[in-house]
Regions:
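Short acidic, glycine/serine/threonine-rich loops at helix termini
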Residues: 36
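Long, low-complexity, charge-rich intrinsically disordered regions
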Residues: 39-167
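Loop-centered beta-sheet repeat module
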Residues: 1-33
Length: 167
């Protein structure tokens, strides 16, 4: 008997369940299935707008973990496309609130371009490195964030990590 998650992965031809456990057939398919079901809004803690996005990104507090476009740009040290949004996970809400308070005169609430997500998953924090989430998480968050800049970023990730491709 298999649970509904394993059944779903079997139906998508991602895994094969047998008496000795699971065999992963396609890591890329698992990643893309996760990406299509991912909803960033569910983890959104704060959203705001700071017009000078580049300086805000460079000046983020130490206890945030970059993801999505800025996460890949930091990890790969290149930008496959220009982006106008920053997504990151906040590990210390009090410190982030202080960071926001210091920039209060620059912060607007309309048309947000900075998205702070809750880092409630200890695994997410433990698998991050140098203030950036792991590559599969970056891929999934870019896919979920969508927008015109998403496709060049996703293609660049797959070119750098072919195991993440669908086929």
């Amino acid at each position: 008997m298999t649970n509904k998650v394993v059944r779903k992965l079997e139906q998508a031809s991602c895994v094969e369940a047998g008496p000795r456990g699971l065999r992963v057939l396609s890591p890329g398919r698992i990643l893309n299935l996760w990406a299509t079901e991912r909803r960033l809004q569910g983890e959104m803690w704060k959203s705001l707008r700071i017009d000078d996005l580049a300086s805000a990104e460079a000046d983020l507090p130490r206890d945030v973990i970059l993801t999505a476009f800025s996460g890949w740009a930091t990890h790969a040290k290149r930008r496959p496309a220009e982006y106008a949004r920053i997504h990151f996970y906040v590990t210390d809400k009090t410190a982030f609130e202080s960071w926001m308070e210091f920039r209060r005169d620059k912060v607007r609430r309309t048309n947000p371009n900075i998205f702070a997500l809750e880092a409630h998953d200890l695994h997410l924090v433990n698998t991050s490195s140098r203030g950036v989430v792991c590559v599969p998480q970056i891929y999934v968050d870019i896919y979920a964030a969508d927008g015109p800049e998403a496709q060049p970023f996703l293609k660049d990730i797959v070119a750098s990590f072919p195991a993440l491709a669908l086929w």
